[in-house]
Curated annotation (Swiss-Prot):
The modification N6-(pyridoxal phosphate)lysine is found at K66. A motif (CCCFC) lies at residues 191-195. It comes from Legionella pneumophila subsp. pneumophila (strain Philadelphia 1 / ATCC 33152 / DSM 7513). Responsible for the formation of the pyrimidine heterocycle in the thiamine biosynthesis pathway. Catalyzes the formation of hydroxymethylpyrimidine phosphate (HMP-P) from histidine and pyridoxal phosphate (PLP). The protein uses PLP and the active site histidine to form HMP-P, generating an inactive enzyme. The enzyme can only undergo a single turnover, which suggests it is a suicide enzyme. One of its GO terms (molecular function) is 4-amino-5-hydroxymethyl-2-methylpyrimidine phosphate synthase activity from histidine and PLP. Changing F120A: Decreases catalytic activity. Keywords: Iron, Metal-binding, Pyridoxal phosphate, Thiamine biosynthesis, Transferase. This is 4-amino-5-hydroxymethyl-2-methylpyrimidine phosphate synthase. InterPro entries: NMT1/THI5, SsuA/THI5. It is an enzyme of class 2 (transferase). The keyword Transferase applies. Pathway: Cofactor biosynthesis; thiamine diphosphate biosynthesis. Signal peptide: none annotated. Homodimer.
Length: 316
């Protein structure tokens, strides 16, 4: 068969290994929603999660998944990436530790090993320590990537940054009672938007509006199905990835349900707060325009419906 006769695939690079917070994507794939949009989607996992924004920015893949703060940083570095929608809205993020560690407040990091995911995690920890009057030489920061739970379990660190609906659940499952110190509360942000998980695209994908609109229509249907029929959605996830059929992952799925975005909308308020916070952390400069990081123009005007409307009651 000639290569030209093969239907081209559309690529989506996840931010980590496939897990319950990717459920809307897997549901849309399993139920054929992407196929109905004439999208043959190849879902890829990164060998190193820190490579995702660069790979997307270079146009090597069509779509990617990444946290809001990393999307802002990538744009500031010159990578042409844009958020076209939201997968997870404000999953609470914070320092996780075992209760037996003796860490009950942020001041208790003195003399401890503090794990962080990437360069911005260290900036956040050091900034909070500075504001709290903690000597930066009195604690040790350790880059451990996304595997916070394993690092605590192996006694590599005493505490580390993670999601309340994921790493905290993992650590409780492995080791028992935990402590969770929310970063948004420590930093007075009023929301945990900096770790919202976004769908990001390179410039070349933005130039294909029908592809982007079709991807978002299908994904929005997957998100609606996930929140409306969680038991069926989890079953579809497990059919796609049988290794996720465990009590632990089922609990992570249940804890993640409140944070799935049904509309996929980029929330202006959240981007504004993240813009101000990243300026405070000196990740971006004062002249950086946060509005260039995201767009809602490709999202459906109304959610998908199996029912044909009797009339449009909003018309004049």
């Amino acid at each position: 068969m000639a290569m030209s006769s093969l239907k081209s695939r559309v690529t989506l690079l996840l931010n980590w290994y496939t897990n319950p917070y990717h459920t809307p994507i897997l549901v849309a794939q399993q139920l054929g929603f992407y196929s109905e949009e004439d999208i043959k989607l190849a879902i890829l996992e990164p060998a190193d999660p820190s490579d995702v924004t660069e790979i997307v920015g270079l146009g090597t893949v069509d779509f990617g998944v990444k946290a809001m703060i990393h999307t802002v940083a990538a744009k500031a570095k010159g990578y042409p990436v844009t958020s076209i929608g939201t997968l997870l809205d404000e999953p609470p993020t914070g320092l996780i530790a075992l209760k037996s560690s003796g860490i009950n407040s942020f001041q208790d990091i003195v003399g401890k090993r503090v794990g962080y995911i990437g360069e911005f995690g260290k900036k956040i920890i050091d900034d909070l320590a500075s504001l709290a009057g903690i000597d930066p030489t009195s604690y040790k920061t350790v880059r451990i990537g996304m595997n916070v739970t394993d690092a605590i379990y192996r006694d590599v660190i005493d505490t580390g940054i993670g999601f309340i609906n994921f790493q905290k659940v993992e650590l409780e499952h492995l080791c028992g009672e935990t402590v969770f110190l929310r970063i948004d509360q420590l930093a007075g942000l009023g929301c945990c938007c900096f770790c919202s998980i976004q769908f990001i695209v390179p410039e070349i994908t933005l130039q294909q509006p029908e592809l982007v609109k079709g991807f978002l229509r299908a994904t929005q249907r997957g998100a609606a199905y996930t929140t409306e029929k969680p038991e069926e959605a989890y079953e579809l996830l497990c059919q796609a990835k049988p290794q996720l059929r465990t009590p632990l992952y089922q609990k992570i799925f249940t804890r993640t349900l409140p944070f799935f975005s049904r509309t996929l909308i980029n929330v202006d308020r959240d981007w504004d707060k993240v813009g101000r916070y990243t300026k405070h952390l000196k990740i971006i400069d004062e002249h950086f325009d946060i509005s260039q990081c995201y767009t809602n123009r490709f999202l459906p005007d109304t959610p998908y419906s199996d029912l044909k409307p009797i009339a449009c009651c909003l018309e004049n």
